[in-house]
Each structure stands twice: as C-alpha cells, then as structure tokens.
Amino acid sequence: MNRARLQLASLWLLLTVTLQAVASAMGTTEREMDVKALIRVTPLQAEESGGVGQGNLTLEGLFARVAEISPAEGRLLQFHPLSLCNTSEDDQTKPGFISIVKLETPDRDTQPCLSLANKARLAGERGAHAVLFDITNDRGALQQLQQPAGINQPVVLIWGPDAEKLMDVVNKNKEALVKIEVQEQPKWLHHDIWILLTVAGTVMFFVLYAVARLLCRQPPPQDSIQQQTLLAISRLGTRRYQQRMLKDQRASGGWVETASTSSSVPVCAICLEEFTDGQELRILPCCHEYHLGCVDPWLRQNHTCPLCMYDILDSGTPPRPLAHRAPSQTQLWGRYPGSARLMSHLPPHGTPMVFPTPNNSLFLPRAPYYLDHTHHWQMPEQMAMQMRTHRRGAEGTRELGISPGCQDSSGYLPDDPGSDSSSGPCHGSSSENCTDISLHCLHGTSSSSVHSSQSNQEDSSPPALASYLLPQGELPALNPLLSTQASYASHVHFHQHRHHHYRRNQPSMSHSHPHRSKRRTKVSRADPSYYREHRHTTGANGELRSLMVRREPRPSCSRTCFDPRTNREHPRHQQSMPQAASVVQGSSEPDVATSLRGSRTDPPSRTYRKKKSSAPSHLPLLYSPRHCHPANSVQMSESSHPRWAEEVRLLHSRVNSHRENTAMMHLYHPPHHNQGATEEIEAVCEHAV
C-alpha cells in the first residue's frame, strides 16, 4: 500500500510540473503574440562642435492593444505627463508629429488626472500621429494599455536601453525624424505552439490514466485468502504417532510407509525432533508429515509444504493419494530391495512410498524356468543352447534379488569370463579360503542368486531366471498356489580356478517343481557303518595323491530298478539275465558316464572325453549305481555272465574310487549340498591336487 501511495505522489508531482510548464509556455506565447514595432530615428542636424556625429537609430517597441496597430511617421516631440492633463487650446502645435511621454513612478502621481488611454487620445486630438510611452519607471502601464479603447493613433510602449537612447536624443534638443513600422511575425510560431500543446496534452492524459488505474485497482481482500487457508488446513488429515505399532506393522509387512515413516528414525523436518508416541501429526496431500504445532503456523502464512513447496490451495493439481507415485521411481518391496519392479501411469507429483512384499519369508526360487519371445515356459534343456549364444552379452544382468547385507547369498561375487580369480574376493587364495567365504555367507537354506560365467563355456548351465523376466502373476515366491515348503533354491557354486564344481543331481519329479532334485540324506558320523580312512596313491606321472575314503551303508535294495531310458521303474526278476543281456547288446545303450550323469543336454567336457575312452562301452542296464545299489546284483552277474562280472567289478571299483575322491570335497562343503557327476569331481580333484 505504501508503494502505491508513493507512485501516486510521483505521478501527481509530474502532472503539476507539466501543467506549470504549459502555463508558462502559453504566457510566453501570448507575450510573443503582441505585435512588435520597429522605431527608426533619423537626426535632422548633425553636431558641428567636433564630436562624433550620431547616426540613425533602430529601436524596438511594442504596440499597445488600446489603439490600432498601424505604421506612423513624423517629427519627434516630447510631452510632459501633466501637459496632457490640460485641455486648453493655448498651446498650438503643428500636426504630424510623434509625441513621446516619459511616465514617472506611481508613487509620485498617486492621483493622476487622466488615465493613460485618455492621455493618448488627447495627444491624438492635438495632432500627434502616434504616441510613444517610456514605461521604464512604471511597468504597470503595460497592463493598463492592453484593453482596447478605440483610439485611431497607434500607441507604442518602449522601455530599457532603447528608451534611454531615444530620451538622449530628446534631452539634447535635437530634431529627428521618427518612423514607426510594424514588424512581421514568423510563420512557424503557431506551429510550435500547437506541437507544445499536443505533447503537454499527451503527457497529461497518460498521467491521469495511471492515477485512475491506481485508484481503481484494489488488492484482493486478505480475509478471503486467510479463510481459504484455514479451510484447507481443516480438511487435512491427522494421525497419532505410535512407534511400537509401527514396528509391529513393519515386521508383519502390513503397513504402507509414507515419506516420513520410511526412515528408521522419523523426524519432523521443521523442528528436527523425532516423533514420539502420542504426538499429533499433520499429513499433507504430498504425503509429508510434520508436528501439528510446527506445520500449522507455517501453513497459515505460506500455505505450502516446507519440503516440496506443494500448495494446499492449488485446486488445479489434485493431491496425490498414498497409493500413487511418480512413474520414474522404483517401487521397492519391504525387506528385500533387490526384488523390485517399475510402476507406470502414475501422477508425477509427490513422494515415493515403499510397499512391503506379501510374503517376506520367501526368496524368489531359482528354478530353471525360462521365457521365450512368446512368453511361454520352456524347459532348461530347450533353452540351454539359446542361452549360451547370449551368455557374453547378458553378463551385466546376471545378478538380481540380492540382499544388501550379503550381496551373494551363496558366497562371493563371481568374476567376469576370462578374468583371474584374484580379482574376486579370494584374491588368488586357495580353495579353502573361497569355501570359507562361501560357507560364511549362507543364510539358512542355501539359496544362490548368482550364476557366474564358467571357465568352460560348453559345461555351463543356463543362468537362473531373473526376477524381472517373470510376469508379476507368475512369480513363484508371490504365487499363493505354490507350496512355501517346496520353494527353495539349490546351491550352485562355480569358481574360476576350477577347484570345485557342483552340479544338480538327476532331476526328479516333485510336486512343487518338476526340475528340483532331491537332497541326499546326511549320514551321521556316529553310525558304526560310517567311517573314513586316508589313502596315499601315486599317479602315473609320479605325483602323490592323498585321498580320504568315506564308507556309507548301502541302502536296502528294492525290488524295482529305475530305467534311465524310459524314466520308469520295472521289476528286476521279470526276465532272466541272458534275455536282459541280449536286449542290452542289441540296443544303443549310452555309456556309464551318461547313465551316471542323468539327462543332460550339455556336451561332455574335455576331461570327461578323456575318461570316457577308458570306461567300458557296454554295461548291463540293471546296474545303475545312482538308482539301485544291491550287493547281490554283482554276484548274480558273476554267476551268469563272467565277462560282465569282470567289467562290472572294474566299474564298481571305479565308482567307489570316485566316491572316495569326493571325501576331500566334503571337508569344505557339508553333505547336504547337491553333488555333481563323479567324473567331473574326479577331474576337479586331480586339478586341485
């Protein structure tokens, strides 16, 4: 308001100055509009006393409006002011002269006999062609002679230096001829006047318009804004802070966190004090929370959020609900930040909120399910070859769903393909240190979310399904139809040094997952049939090999054996041994390594091809060390087929040696881990020794 008053005062001062300038210009113009007279004085007799003769004089005067404006000519003759009061006819003068009258100060002549207009008329009656008034001592005579009086003789007013020069000629009793002429007015004088008046009028118009606008412009009443602010504050939500209840709801995963409760220690952004139980909190439309006594005074003055400057009076932008969030922000699940998915088509305003997972006790299972381009499930055997071609390009997305406490639940982060193991956490250490790290990071059930690139690309298994490749409704960990007990992850651990290599067992049909392998039961060391012994052998190249043998009790033989070709079980004594032998010899039976390894689509490794040449090419179908290990099966083979007995005995000893070689690996990993093929374990053991 003070600023408006200052502007109004400035405009009023400008208007006053403009009006004064216009008035002065108009007065000057009026004076200039008075007709000027040129008085030419020509002496009749020159002085012969030796002085310098005076020449002609040209003086300027002003025609008075009391008489007509016309030129005149005559001899110069002086009259006293009092002589013009006498109307007697005693003083006779020749007509045709020009009278000059020097006026005295008004103090001396307080009561003049006649007015100046009457004196000029009287001089004209006496024969004067014109009257000259010297008004040097009486400047008021100019105003007296401005009123027209109908005098026929011109009246000229003269003052200043020009009047002194003319009186000097009279005082020396010199005769002179005076000629009065009318001076021509300049033609551009009227144009200048109109230009000045136009500019002055324009300035005055704008000044008046600005003043009227300031007077008509009224600020909005402060009461209406205050009422709107109070109404908006009354509509805002409040809640009572309860810290214990908040912790319970966070633990159960049933609390939707806001911007202030997402921190471990929620504080008020205004007073910077922590929220305590029982305090009233004000919830703004932007999901920010403050103390009721801290934010209400701020809202009454500014009606905006202190953090995000959201205007609570802004009706154009609707307040964002709690369930919405900006599309560029990631929605995190409550306990596992790695399990995330992007939300879209949400309002852009507000603060992100965190939603808990429906079941925080489950990890995403690392089952070998895959999605093709048509979003259909495929078996790992079908996707193995496809994933190998894109293995090197997809190395940057191998790791998802890792908890922040231990990024790799199976042990350590894998190295890139072709890099040395010293770049990883082991830094060139032995297999024991890597195994210790692997065992140190296990959480309950061994769940591995990392499938590193292996040293042998042909022996690599397809990586586990990333959580972002699965549809939302098809996530096994979030599907309520799946059994929670069956959702577990197997431990698959690889290392660049090829120190140890674990593979899944032969896939078994399970009700929870068709590609999960059953775990082998851990044999108690207190069992009398369980013992270990150390053996020292010398290899073909002269190197010493130290093996530790673990004897386990053989399970009781069932009456059926598993056929790897048909994936079915059949009774052992349906036919005699010679018939079985003929069937085996006539069919294209895979080798022992293929039977032991199970159904695999990966090509055999280089170490396996070397061992394959020394293994027997044909074995009885009924002998499968992985599925059925009866002691009497070998004896029956010896009695019926001696040739088979020798081969089976060699293979049985070879399998036992493979089992013995795995004893060193059990020192570093407990028996509950999934075991790999015996040939691959032997190759790894050779490399380690």
From Swiss-Prot:
One of its GO terms (molecular function) is transferase activity. Gene3D superfamilies: 3.50.30.30, Zinc/RING finger domain, C3HC4 (zinc finger) (3.30.40.10). A zinc finger (RING-type) spans 268-308. Its EC number is 2.3.2.27. The chain crosses the membrane at residues 192-212. Pathway: Protein modification; protein ubiquitination. Residues 492-504, 512-523 have a biased composition (Basic residues). Its main location: membrane. Residues 386-430, 445-467, 492-639 are annotated as: Disordered. It holds the Pfam family zf-RING_2. Keywords: Cell membrane, Developmental protein, Disulfide bond, Endoplasmic reticulum, Glycoprotein, Membrane, Metal-binding, Nucleus, Signal, Transferase, Transmembrane, Transmembrane helix, Ubl conjugation pathway, Wnt signaling pathway, Zinc, Zinc-finger. This is E3 ubiquitin-protein ligase RNF43.
